[in-house]
Structure formats: structure tokens, C-alpha cells
């Protein structure tokens, strides 16, 4: 599987993402700078990693979505390419119009950095096929603007089209306000595009892929990608 990670000024999770992709897929991704105007040929996957692109000036993801490389990422996605956006990458995807909704300031107005539980809401995607439907996975979050918002019509469409990939939940899989760390509507932690080839999610699966790091809750996401795209 050939993959590339987009690196912006302020990105800080590109090496974690590269390690996870290499560990599970056996091949290191290419790093692509934000000022580039084209993606490498022959890619199967483009990743927008976490961090604070352009220092989160204006608002999280706003400047990243308007960087030179995003035109190429948009063309790649529109041509049916697979794109994964994690944390700041999810924010960029919504700002770029590749996913619906917006990521707002957390409910309590504080930066959140801790492990959370996610419930897998669909396995009909190249990002979740190695999970079990309804499986609960423990993964970290680290964000200030992770409160997913969309209007009622968009939320209904996401649900009707089975495009909610992950919801925040308690350890037993119960979904509710108490287990949603940032106030996201419908406890949404990750969503898919209409063609199911673009995934945006706030939690960081790349940080829990091997037991030595404290767990493997994120590993099945990378297994899904490798098995689906190789």
C-alpha cells in the first residue's frame, strides 16, 4: 500500500502516524509538504495528521484547508482516492468541504488530553472492516476544538446512510452525554464521506497500535486500511 502524509507548519503527529502505518502495513509513507502543488503518483491513501496547522490561526483547520496541497488532496478525493483525517486533519476536511459539519470549541472550553472509549458504528468501510460492529475501542484524544456540530438534516443523513464511523461511549458501550468528552452532537467521533472513502475522526488511533504503548485500540483501523487497499 502506497501512502502519503501531508505536513503543515504546526503538524505534530506525522511521525506517530508514519510509525503506525509502517508497523501495520510494512511500508513507510511519503511525507508531502504543504507548499507542494501535487501528490506523488500511485497513492492509495493520503493522511492529514493531527497537530495545529498554521498555529490554528483564524480557526482550527481553516488555513490548512486553503494551503496549496489541499487542491491536490481535493482532486484525489473527488477522483475516488482514500483520505484519512485525524484530529486537526478532520478539522481540515470539514473546512475544505470534503466532509459535512464543523468542529467547534470543546463544551467546557478546555483542552482535553486523555483516553476515551469509542463504539464502532459501521464496519462497512475500508477504515473499520477489521473491527466488530459495536466493538468498543480505547483510544486517546488531544484537542481543544473537537466538538462536532452539524444541523439536524445533516445528522439525519449521516445516520440514514450509515456514515457515522465512531461514537464516544462508556466502557460498556453506552452512548450518552456523560461519555462524550467534548459535547459533540450525537456523540459523533468520526464520520465518512458519501462514497465511504474519506474518514475524519478526532481521536488518535495511531497512538495505540502496540501493547508497549498501553493498548491496541487503534490497530484495527490500520489493519482495515491495509487489508482494504493493498
Curated annotation (Swiss-Prot):
Pfam family, one: GATase_5
Record field: transmembrane: none
Swiss-Prot/TrEMBL keywords: ATP-binding, Cytoplasm, Glutamine amidotransferase, Hydrolase, Ligase, Nucleotide-binding, Purine biosynthesis
EC numbers, comma separated: 6.3.5.3, 3.5.1.2
SMART domains given in the database record: GATase_5
Single GO MF descriptor: phosphoribosylformylglycinamidine synthase activity
Residue ranges of domain Glutamine amidotransferase type-1 in the record: 3-230
InterPro entries: Class_I_gatase-like, PRibForGlyAmidine_synth_PurQ
One Gene Ontology term from the biological process aspect of the record: 'de novo' IMP biosynthetic process
Annotated pathway: Purine metabolism; IMP biosynthesis via de novo pathway; 5-amino-1-(5-phospho-D-ribosyl)imidazole from N(2)-formyl-N(1)-(5-phospho-D-ribosyl)glycinamide: step 1/2
Main location: cytoplasm
GO cellular component: cytoplasm
Catalytic residues of the enzyme: 87 (nucleophile), 204, 206
Localization: Cytoplasm
Catalytic activity: N(2)-formyl-N(1)-(5-phospho-beta-D-ribosyl)glycinamide + L-glutamine + ATP + H2O = 2-formamido-N(1)-(5-O-phospho-beta-D-ribosyl)acetamidine + L-glutamate + ADP + phosphate + H(+); L-glutamine + H2O = L-glutamate + NH4(+)
Function, in words: Part of the phosphoribosylformylglycinamidine synthase complex involved in the purines biosynthetic pathway. Catalyzes the ATP-dependent conversion of formylglycinamide ribonucleotide (FGAR) and glutamine to yield formylglycinamidine ribonucleotide (FGAM) and glutamate. The FGAM synthase complex is composed of three subunits. PurQ produces an ammonia molecule by converting glutamine to glutamate. PurL transfers the ammonia molecule to FGAR to form FGAM in an ATP-dependent manner.
Summary of subunit composition and partner proteins: Part of the FGAM synthase complex composed of 1 PurL, 1 PurQ and 2 PurS subunits.
Name used for this protein in its record: Phosphoribosylformylglycinamidine synthase subunit PurQ
Source organism (scientific name): Rhodospirillum rubrum (strain ATCC 11170 / ATH 1.1.1 / DSM 467 / LMG 4362 / NCIMB 8255 / S1)
Upper taxonomic lineage: Bacteria, Pseudomonadati, Pseudomonadota, Alphaproteobacteria, Rhodospirillales
Gene: purQ
Amino acid at each position: 500500500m502506497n501512502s502519503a502524509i501531508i505536513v503543515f507548519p504546526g503538524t505534530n503527529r506525522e511521525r506517530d502516524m508514519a510509525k503506525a502505518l509502517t508497523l501495520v502495513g510494512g511500508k513507510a509513507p511519503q511525507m508531502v509538504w504543504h507548499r507542494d502543488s501535487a501528490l506523488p503518483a500511485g497513492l492509495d491513501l493520503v493522511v492529514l495528521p493531527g497537530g495545529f496547522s498554521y498555529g490554528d490561526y483564524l480557526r482550527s483547520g481553516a488555513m490548512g484547508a486553503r494551503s496549496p496541497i489541499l487542491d491536490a488532496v481535493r482532486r484525489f478525493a473527488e477522483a475516488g482516492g482514500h483520505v484519512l483525517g485525524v484530529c486537526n486533519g478532520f478539522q481540515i476536511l470539514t473546512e475544505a468541504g470534503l466532509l459535512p459539519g464543523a468542529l467547534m470549541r470543546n463544551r467546557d472550553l478546555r483542552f482535553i488530553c486523555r483516553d476515551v472509549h469509542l463504539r464502532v458504528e459501521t464496519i462497512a468501510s475500508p477504515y473499520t472492516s477489521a473491527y466488530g460492529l459495536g466493538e468498543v475501542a480505547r483510544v486517546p484524544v488531544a484537542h481543544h476544538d473537537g466538538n462536532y456540530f452539524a444541523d439536524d438534516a445533516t445528522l439525519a443523513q449521516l445516520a440514514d446512510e450509515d456514515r457515522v464511523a465512531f461514537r464516544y461511549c462508556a466502557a460498556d458501550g453506552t452512548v450518552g452525554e456523560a461519555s462524550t468528552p467534548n459535547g459533540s452532537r450525537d456523540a459523533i467521533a468520526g464520520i465518512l464521506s458519501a462514497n465511504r472513502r474519506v474518514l475524519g475522526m478526532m481521536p488518535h488511533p495511531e497512538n495505540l497500535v502496540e501493547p508497549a504503548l498501553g493498548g491496541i485500540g487503534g490497530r484495527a483501523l490500520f489493519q482495515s486500511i491495509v487489508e482494504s487497499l493493498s
